[in-house]
Regions:
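Charged, heptad-repeat coiled-coil alpha-helices that serve as long linker/dimerization "arms"
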Residues: 1-80
Length: 80
């Protein structure tokens, strides 16, 4: 097993990816809650369209963050 200082950057990468996933998930929950509100669909304008675009953006970011987390986790496990 490599010494702890050698693993520290790998642990930080995993923790950073986990924090990013948590932040993105929280944002996604907010967007989904707004899209679940029936009242939003009776309003004129582009609110729904903008929320759908935001949802799609967040879905892409979550997928990328999950890949970064998995890669970091695998590197940490390989260093064990």
């Amino acid at each position: 097993m490599p010494p702890e200082p050698a693993r520290r950057p790998l642990k930080k990468a995993v923790e950073s990816a986990e924090k990013m996933l948590a932040r993105l998930t929280e944002q996604m929950d907010g967007v989904l809650a707004r899209l679940a509100d029936p009242a939003i669909y009776s309003r004129p304008g582009t609110v729904v369209t903008e929320l759908q675009k935001e949802k799609a953006r967040l879905e892409r970011e979550v997928a990328n963050a999950e890949k970064r987390w998995l890669s970091a986790q695998e590197a940490l496990e390989a260093a064990a």
